[in-house]
Amino acid sequence: MYKGVILSVLASLTFGVLYFYTEFLKPLDSEQTFAWRMLSTLPFLTLFMWWSGDLSRVAEIFKRLLQKPQLILWLIISSFLCTTQLWLFLWGPINGRGLEVSLGYFLLPLVMVLVGCVLYKEKLSYWQIAAVVLAVIGVSHEIWRMGQIAWETAYVAVAYPLYFFLRRVFKTDHLGGFWWDLACVIPVAIYLAAFHSNSFAVIAHFPHLIWAVIGLGFLSCLGLGSYMLASRYLPFVIFGLLSYLEPVLLAFASMVLGERISADEWLTYVPIWLAVLLLVLEGSLHLIQQQRKQRALAQNVAALEERLEDKSPK
């Protein structure tokens, strides 16, 4: 559980850095950036899985594929659901649609909570219920303010929960499954990088892009790998609520990139920030209670050992 929380927080922090990191990838456009993100992430992910001993997961899925060739259909669908989200994540800030994308990440945790409660019968604590209510207020206000839900928002909010749910159904909810998501899109990435637009010429003209692409691969591996592992270790409800840290960081990143929160948008963001604060407080109180229980248990064990020593024959 704690491992999942740490991984989720690490993923959110890394995604916040990545949102800002797009500035270092100019003048690559969103398609070129996406292509190089896929091409640079897979080697880092493979290296990490070799180091952690998870590379066998890739072979495990390959064996399943040989036994049931129809599994390739799921791998293609999984890759599409995953990688189109990664493309949109980069496309948004580059094309001035960062806040629409970030609103999708505001709505996403609510959909995740709904999936957890309905499909997995998971229960919410009082703190989590309060956080959900605040989140509903913020998201509802934003939908009312905009008058509609942008397609970027809807796609983020719906496709990700579907992706994580189906990963559990098809038992690919581990790094091996994510490796296949990236591997399936590599032909598309090569086409976008080399043929759709000659990004090699752009990189040759701007040599700093070589290091920027390497950094993109490392950060993507760190963030996405942590995110995928967190989805495996955490219940759907907790995983969804912890995801609220990400849109908070994305909103700040969007403002750093030049977008601004207007006066009528604050009723969207303040309730979300309060929801995140409640989750942090709940987590902190839970940690304090756990530490107290551990101390009390240690004291009881010490007292018991002392009584046993007193009763033992001298």
Model-derived segments and spans:
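Membrane-interface interhelical linkers
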Residues: M1-L13, P43-I77, Y126, F178, ...
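Hydrophobic/aromatic residues within transmembrane alpha-helices
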Residues: L25, T33, R37, G92-P93, ...
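Membrane-interface helix termini and inter-helical loops of multi-pass transporters
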Residues: F20-E31, A59-F62, W91-R97, V139-R145, ...
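Glycine-/small-residue-enriched transmembrane alpha-helix faces in small-molecule transporters
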Residues: M1-F34, I137-V169, Q294-K314
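C-terminal transmembrane-helix exit sites in multi-pass transporters
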Residues: L107-W127, V248-L267
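C-terminal-most transmembrane helix of multi-pass membrane proteins
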Residues: M146, Y244-K314
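Hydrophobic alpha-helical transmembrane segments of multi-pass membrane transport proteins
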Residues: V9-V17, Y21, I76-P93, Y155-L166, ...
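Helix-helix packing/entry segments at the starts of transmembrane helices
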Residues: S102-L107, H174-C184, C221-M255
